């Protein structure tokens, strides 16, 4: 974990020595391990998107033992470009990249052989990149629709039963259990309880839709520890009014959670991506906030830590 605050010990040490009044958390891979849910959903959404339909982009690989098109390391590396905190946006950006690759055969196996995410990311110096940046660089593809991405992604993540319940329609692309069932709690609830006992308020600023955020927090019995929550739902509502993107690294979700907690407090924001750190940096214009990088679940923690350090100031 990267933090500018020095570690201390003892009861109420955080409150007394660090003098933070409130902690704001991201959810994914900070409070809840989502490597096998959200990140895997990105991979499977891309595979379905490219290989499903009467005239698919690519023919699917044969055999039950076929390798996935992308790895978790690929997804993590791509997200370091910035502007891809939202998983639908990340999926969109990856599809733009994949469909720009030169292939001789229209098969997923051939496409896999051309993928070099790390090399592509290394070349990009102007960050955050985001969906607009990658389409400016590689060109927009008329076959990539965010609505279709969202539909496939939600079917895979929620699973047949919950998707039908929440969307009031039956799944088309995925009729199995949802990958959200694979999620695990990162910390024991007692840690949050100790923070509350120390007089620290707790908030959340997440890119999850509100239903998915509340569902997960309630499932792991930690919802009641949080005094304020800002989700993608509130971000989209504000975007509709302001006619601009307010997703991380924009500080909107942090500022909104801080407003609910009391904006004059001193905040610590804990996230796992450069977008999180950059959002906190941007929020410093309006509130007293520091950030802590939390690359615990990165496939390459040292590399992730170095990228987070570049963003911190």
PLM feature spans:
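Non-catalytic, alpha-helical, charged scaffold/linker segments
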Residues: 58-160
């Amino acid at each position: 974990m990267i933090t500018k605050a020095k570690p201390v010990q003892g009861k109420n040490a955080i409150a007394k020595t660090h003098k933070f009044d409130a902690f704001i958390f991201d959810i994914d891979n900070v409070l809840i391990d989502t490597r096998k849910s959200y990140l895997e959903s990105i991979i499977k959404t891309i595979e379905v998107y490219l290989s499903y339909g009467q005239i698919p982009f690519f023919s699917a690989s044969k055999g039950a033992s076929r390798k996935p098109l992308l790895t978790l390391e690929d997804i993590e590396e791509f997200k370091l470009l910035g502007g891809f905190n939202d998983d639908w946006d990340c999926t969109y950006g990856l599809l733009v990249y994949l469909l720009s690759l030169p292939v001789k055969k229209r098969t997923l196996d051939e496409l896999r052989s051309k993928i070099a995410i790390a090399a592509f990311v290394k070349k990009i110096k102007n960050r955050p990149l985001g969906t607009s940046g990658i389409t400016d660089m590689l060109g927009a593809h008329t076959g990539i629709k965010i609505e279709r991405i969202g539909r496939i992604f939600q079917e895979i993540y929620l699973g047949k039963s919950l998707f039908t319940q929440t969307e009031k329609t039956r799944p088309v692309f995925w009729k199995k259990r949802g990958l959200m069932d694979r999620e695990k709690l990162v910390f024991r609830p007692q840690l949050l309880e100790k923070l509350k006992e120390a007089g620290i308020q707790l908030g959340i600023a997440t890119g999850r839709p509100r239903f998915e955020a509340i569902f997960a927090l309630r499932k792991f019995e930690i919802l009641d520890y949080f005094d304020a929550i800002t989700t993608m739902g509130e971000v989209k509502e504000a975007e509709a009014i302001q006619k601009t993107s307010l997703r991380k690294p924009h500080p909107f979700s942090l500022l909104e959670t801080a407003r609910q907690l009391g904006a004059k407090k001193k905040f610590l924001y804990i996230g796992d991506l450069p977008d999180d750190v950059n959002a906190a940096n941007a929020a410093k214009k309006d509130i007293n906030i520091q950030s802590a990088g939390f690359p615990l679940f990165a496939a390459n923690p040292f590399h992730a830590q170095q990228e987070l350090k570049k963003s911190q100031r």
